[in-house]
Amino acid sequence: MKLPIIAVIGRPNVGKSTLVNRIAGDQQAIVHDQPGITRDRTYRPGFWQDRNFQIVDTGGIVFDDHEEFLPLIREQAAIALAEAAVALFVVDGQAGLNAADQEIADWLRQQNVPVVLAVNKCESLEQGYTQAAEFWELGMEEPFPISAIHGSGTGDLLDKVIEYLPTITDVEEDTTINVAIIGRPNVGKSSLLNALTGEQRAIVSPISGTTRDAIDTIIERNGQQYRLIDTAGIRRKKNVDYGAEFFSINRAFKAIRRADVVLFVIDVLDGVTEQDLKLAGRIIDEGRAVIIVANKWDAVEKDTYTINQYRKELQARLFFMEWAEMLFISAQTGQRVNKILDLVDQAAESHRRRVSTAVINEVIQEAVSWHSPPTSRQGKQGRIYYGTQVRSQPPTISLFVNDPKRFNDSYRRYIEKQFRQDLGFAGTPIRLVWRGKRVRDAERGTPNRATKV
């Protein structure tokens, strides 16, 4: 069941993201003293007085500045209000009431949503009520003095906010598939997000680095929900300034860890760059399922053999991801975008799958019968006693052997290939853990001696 939404609204640098982090209980929205850090709308789960909800952090609203992003930020805020049960209007108690606050208040009155006014940066109780008093002029009913940094006043504020939330009696088990959209700056991640959602969800601009936060949106298809996480483009370290962009890149890496499946977006015109390779390595290290999305295919001059040529070139560079599905798309025109979620379903199922020990050992027996383990120069042959899956996400199989050193890389790749081929693992890494075990211990630990190989 969809949770009710609280939209956080206000001008830049009044502490909206700090308040969202306070309510959500951890630091995920980027907090920095530079105005305009949050550009897109960012969804976070929240809980208060036995009530579950989502809280949406939006970009700072400005009406008298005509920079490129500002109309887009207002559009994102308007979309957040359209789906919200209540708006949380944040102002700066230290700066006091100003014309920008009044403009936002007038704009909010035009929206069909109740508003609760939070006067932030009130660091003491006595001063807080004095600072909040002048905001009665906005005509937004009672202003609540709070300190988002220290948490004072936020309890009373939330008590008021949840009065506007609809009651949810049943919350279904979360079977949502988390999908992180990852790639270098300006490869088309936000355009892909918009193509998947069918709306202008993230700010799209030809300027590299438009998206700063890892932002979430939920879509549903055939009863399956997907949480799409668009992230800041990841640059080379020497091109990263300490500050907002540094935090965004760390947030993107955290988004990879949150994901079940990563859409690894590559600019097909650039091919696989060194930064792409490093990013691919990070995805592999985190053990995420992957779909390689080769974007901007509409800009390539093609003939009958073009796609095969490009596929071979990309696979040669990403040889360590040979198990990942590769899709050539155009986020701009929508070409093949409709195939992405089918591949996501397949990869997520493989990533979460658990296989019985009996089946794993059948695969091992078959593999060994076709290709025996290598023999050392001293005439000692490797031997696999049995295997068992010890975890999923990614599938991890422990193989108990007489001596791990007797199994070279070639044979290990062969065994992994057999698991993929026989068990149908697609789009996910498989981790094989080779463990040494004495014969007697192996026989004692084998779940079924008939499966020994």
Curated annotation (Swiss-Prot):
Oligomer and partners: Associates with the 50S ribosomal subunit.
Organism: Picosynechococcus sp. (strain ATCC 27264 / PCC 7002 / PR-6) (Agmenellum quadruplicatum)
Family per similarity comment: Belongs to the TRAFAC class TrmE-Era-EngA-EngB-Septin-like GTPase superfamily. EngA (Der) GTPase family.
Domain of life, source organism: Bacteria
Residue ranges annotated for the EngA-type G domain, each copy included: 4-169, 177-352
A Pfam family it matches: KH_dom-like
PROSITE patterns attached to this UniProt entry: G_ENGA
GO molecular function: GTP binding; ribosome binding
Name this protein carries in UniProt: GTPase Der
Alphabetized UniProt keyword annotations: GTP-binding, Nucleotide-binding, Repeat, Ribosome biogenesis
One of the GO BP terms on file: ribosome biogenesis
Transmembrane segments: none
Residues given in the record as GTP 1 binding sites: 10-17, 57-61, 120-123
Residues annotated for GTP 2 binding in this entry: 183-190, 230-234, 295-298
Role this protein plays: GTPase that plays an essential role in the late steps of ribosome biogenesis.
Domain annotation KH-like: ranges: 353-438
